[in-house]
Amino acid sequence: MTARLNFQFLAGLILCACMGLAAIALTERFDWLSNSGLSLLTVAILLGIFLGNLPFLHSTIQKYIAGIQFTKQKILRLGIVLYGFKLTFQDIGDVGLLGAVIDVAVFLSTFTLAIYLGIKFFKLDRDLAILIGAGSAICGAAAILATEPVVKAQNEKVTVAISTVVIFGTISIFAYPVTYQLSQYYFASIDFPAQFGIYIGSTVHEVAQVLAAANSVSDNVADTAVITKMMRVMMLGPFLLVLSMYFIYQDRQKLRHQSSDGAGGSSIFSLASAGIPWFAFLFLVVIGLNSMGLAPKEMTQSLVAIDNFLLAAAMAALGITTHFSAIKKAGLKPLFLAAIVFLWLVFGGGLINIIATVLWSL
């Protein structure tokens, strides 16, 4: 019996690994995928959703669910830690303090807007509002995946949040080059190759989408946009730490309330299980190590390649365990919320960029 369970667990791991490799092969073989803003992570989850929703494979997938769940949870955390090898603290200096200030302002305003509208206006589940806010404010699917273990959201909510990032991030790819032409006409006095790069990097959802949108403008805009985007990505670690501490605080409040009512047993378990996620802390540590340049370049490149594979496998696992019927239940409200947040990124984020640039030049 144990040998059979071990085989099924291993089979689940192998299935996710094969799906991850397939996603990597597709994105490397077909350039139009990345040029269209469909990143490796997006392709991986789409493959997983396709496989997981095939009726004749449902019973087989259920046999391997232990390995699939392990990939979606544990392998994902390892992938997030290794994601730090793509970043360095020196990136901040390359764009300057202005870019950092704009990034922080856009991040805080976007996430706050998503939470407020999602919960207060659209009456969405708190976890879904947080996931949409994190994906829009930080770095798309990677941020949503990293936030999921903290909020312990259901698979369907994660997929709904990721779908909003894909939809409106793809729209960004075509909208921003048009915006650039209009901006040059109305604000001819501003250094646009640099400033518009900061604008794209601080407001577009995914790294791949930033590249696609910025490359449509110019190489200089693309360079600045990517560095600015990387600074946004670096906010992921602190964000996860703060978010987890918020949940700890919430659990403590529940513990006090239930203790006063004479029933606090279950909340103690909840408090113990809501500790600060180790992967968020290690994510920052890895960025620090990468910033020191201690590892050879070849080793860093290998670790980045491994990380791409791990994240792709985790995304495939997420897709496999997601079913269309559950996504339909979410309705149109998440899409409306994401649309408003997207409009804020385009116009509100643009206003933040203009105000910050003008004040900086005084």
Annotate each predicted stretch with a short phrase:
Residues A11-L15, F70, Y83, L87-I115, ...:
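Entry/N-cap segments of selected transmembrane alpha helices
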Residues T2-F70, Y83-D91, P238-D307, A316-A326, ...:
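Structural signature of multi-pass alpha-helical membrane transport proteins
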Residues L124-S172, F192-S218, I306:
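Alpha-helical membrane segments and immediately flanking helix-loop junctions
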Residues S34-F50, Q73, V95-S109, G133-S136, ...:
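Structural signature of hydrophobic alpha-helical transmembrane segments
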Residues F9-L13, Y64-R77, A100-V101, D125-G135, ...:
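Cytoplasmic-side transmembrane-helix entry/capping segments in multi-pass membrane proteins
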Residues L117-K123, S172-Y199, M231-D261, I354-L362:
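Juxtamembrane and boundary regions of transmembrane helices in multi-pass small-molecule transporters
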Residues S59-T60, L87-F89, F121-D127, P149-V160, ...:
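Juxtamembrane helix-boundary/capping and inter-helix hinge elements in multi-pass membrane proteins
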Residues L15-L21, A44-G48, F70-G84, V106, ...:
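Small-residue-rich segments of transmembrane alpha-helices in multi-pass membrane proteins
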